[in-house]
UniProtKB/Swiss-Prot annotation:
Part of the 50S ribosomal subunit. Contacts protein L29, and trigger factor when it is bound to the ribosome. GO terms for biological process: translation. This is Large ribosomal subunit protein uL23. It comes from Polynucleobacter asymbioticus (strain DSM 18221 / CIP 109841 / QLW-P1DMWA-1). Keywords: Ribonucleoprotein, Ribosomal protein, RNA-binding, rRNA-binding. One of the early assembly proteins it binds 23S rRNA. One of the proteins that surrounds the polypeptide exit tunnel on the outside of the ribosome. Forms the main docking site for trigger factor binding to the ribosome.
């Protein structure tokens, strides 16, 4: 299967933001992984290209998880939250992404 390189503008829309949670922090410390919220139509190669473009790091592999939206009630009305997609990005040894902003 050949990989089609998307243009830089469309790759900017793939990553929606980092996932900052207890599980994501434990995974990051233990396995050199970073967790991102990604667009619903993104695939593994899109995520890999976007991370390498934005953060200037080398990506080893990508695992993607589809999360179903939770059912919620608002009074007598039932609905659900939107479905989401997360990507677990394995970085090559020695690579690191730091999300903390430095104050000057």
């Amino acid at each position: 299967m050949s990989q089609v390189r998307k243009n830089d503008h469309s790759l900017m829309k793939v990553l929606l933001g980092p996932v900052i949670s207890e599980k994501a922090t434990m995974v990051a410390e233990k396995n050199e992984q970073v967790v991102f919220q990604v667009a619903r139509d993104a695939n593994k190669s899109d995520v890999k290209q976007a991370v390498e473009l934005l953060f200037k790091v080398q990506v080893d592999s990508v695992q993607i998880v589809n999360q179903k939206g939770k059912p919620k009630r608002y009074g007598r009305f039932e609905g659900r939250r939107d479905h989401t997609k997360k990507a677990y990005v394995n970085l090559k040894p020695g690579q690191e992404i730091n999300f903390e902003a430095e104050a000057n």
